[in-house]
UniProtKB/Swiss-Prot annotation:
Organism: Helicobacter hepaticus (strain ATCC 51449 / 3B1)
One of the GO BP terms on file: amino acid metabolic process
Residue pairs linked by disulfide bridges in the UniProt entry: none
Keyword terms, alphabetized: Pyrimidine biosynthesis, Transferase
Full protein name: Aspartate carbamoyltransferase catalytic subunit
Top-level class of the enzyme under EC nomenclature: transferase
C-alpha cells in the first residue's frame, strides 16, 4: 500500500508535479462534471471561517463526483475536549479518501498526517501556509503571461500588506520565487518578516517597476494589539488605487476577502486588470486537480 500523498505546503510538490496539476486544472475549465472521484469520500474540517476556500474545495470535490462530508466544528466533540489527535483517529477509522483541514495553528496538518492513512490537504494553517491558494495564483499568472510558466522568469511581483501574518504570502514567496519571479515585499516595518528578499516601505516607490500587484488583507484577528494608527492611515499608503496602476500593463491579485478601499480601491476592483474573480474561478479547477493528484496518483 502506497503512503498517502499529502499537500501541506508548496514545497511538497516538485516543479513537474506543479505543472501537471496546472495543466490538469486547465482541462477542467470547460468541464463541470467528471466521475474521477466517484465513490470517494472527502471530509472538510475547518477550525477557521472561510468562504472561498471551503466552498471551492467542496464544489471541486462534487464536480469530480466525490461524496463530501463537512464536519461542523462547533458541533463536534472538539467542543467537549476531544483532542485533535483523537478526532483525526476517529475520522480515519471511517476510511475517508482525503481530509481537508484549516486550522489556526501552524503545522496542524503536519501533526495530523501521522494519525491518518489518507491524504491530508492543508486549506490554511495559521500564518504558515496555504498551498492551494499559491497554486491558483500561479495558474492565474501563467494564463496572463501567454499560458507559459517560463514567461514568469524575471517578472516582478509586489506583495503588499500584512505579510508577517499571511500564510498566502509565505506560500507564494516559495512558489513564485521557484518559477523565477522577483518578489518584492511592500509593507510598514511591523508587517514585514525577517527576510532575504527585497523590501520596501513605500508602494508608490516601486509601483512603476512591477508587473504584478498582490494585495493582502490586514489580518486583525492575528494582531495582539493595534499596530497602526487606523485603517484609514494604512490605506493612504498601501491601498491600490487607479493612480498607482496608472495606464501600465499590470495585473492585480488578492486572495480575498478584500477590504474595499483599504486593500484595493473600488475603481480598481472594476478594472479589467484586476484578476480577483479569475482567481476564484481558477481555485475550483486547481482544487479539482489537487484532489485527483492526492487521491488517485
Amino acid at each position: 500500500m502506497r503512503p498517502p500523498k499529502h499537500l501541506l505546503r508548496t514545497s511538497d510538490l516538485d516543479n513537474s508535479q506543479i505543472e501537471t496539476i496546472l495543466q490538469q486544472a486547465q482541462t477542467y475549465k470547460d468541464m463541470h462534471h467528471r466521475e474521477n472521484l466517484k465513490n470517494k469520500t472527502i471530509i472538510t474540517i475547518f477550525f477557521e471561517n472561510s468562504t472561498r476556500t471551503l466552498s471551492s474545495f467542496e464544489i471541486a470535490a462534487k464536480r469530480l463526483s466525490a461524496d463530501v462530508v463537512r464536519l461542523d466544528v462547533s458541533k463536534s466533540s472538539t467542543t467537549k475536549g476531544e483532542s485533535m489527535s483523537d478526532t483525526a483517529a476517529n475520522l480515519n477509522a471511517m476510511n475517508p479518501s482525503a481530509i481537508i483541514i484549516r486550522h489556526k495553528n501552524a503545522g496542524a496538518g503536519y501533526y495530523l498526517k501521522f494519525q491518518v492513512s489518507c491524504p491530508i490537504i492543508n486549506a490554511g494553517d495559521g500564518a504558515h501556509a496555504h498551498p492551494t491558494q499559491a497554486l491558483l495564483d500561479l495558474l492565474t499568472l501563467k494564463e496572463h503571461f501567454d499560458n507559459d510558466l517560463n514567461n514568469l522568469k524575471g517578472k516582478k511581483i509586489a506583495i503588499i500588506g500584512d505579510i508577517v501574518n499571511s500564510r498566502v504570502a509565505n506560500s507564494n514567496i516559495e512558489l513564485l520565487s521557484r518559477f523565477g519571479m522577483e518578489v518584492i515585499l511592500v509593507a510598514p516595518p511591523h508587517f514585514l518578516p525577517s527576510t532575504h528578499l527585497r523590501t520596501c516601505y513605500s508602494l508608490r516607490e516601486i509601483a512603476k517597476e512591477v508587473d504584478v500587484f498582490m494585495s493582502l488583507r490586514t489580518q486583525t484577528e492575528r494582531h495582539d494589539k493595534q499596530i497602526y494608527g487606523s485603517l484609514k492611515d494604512y490605506a493612504s499608503q498601501y491601498c491600490l488605487t487607479p493612480e498607482i496602476l496608472s495606464d501600465r500593463d499590470v495585473i492585480v491579485l488578492h486572495p480575498g476577502p478584500v477590504h474595499r478601499n483599504i486593500d484595493i480601491d473600488d475603481e480598481v476592483l472594476k478594472d479589467p486588470r484586476c484578476k480577483v474573480l479569475e482567481q476564484v474561478t481558477n481555485g475550483v479547477c486547481v482544487r479539482m486537480a489537487v484532489l485527483e493528484f492526492c487521491i488517485c496518483t
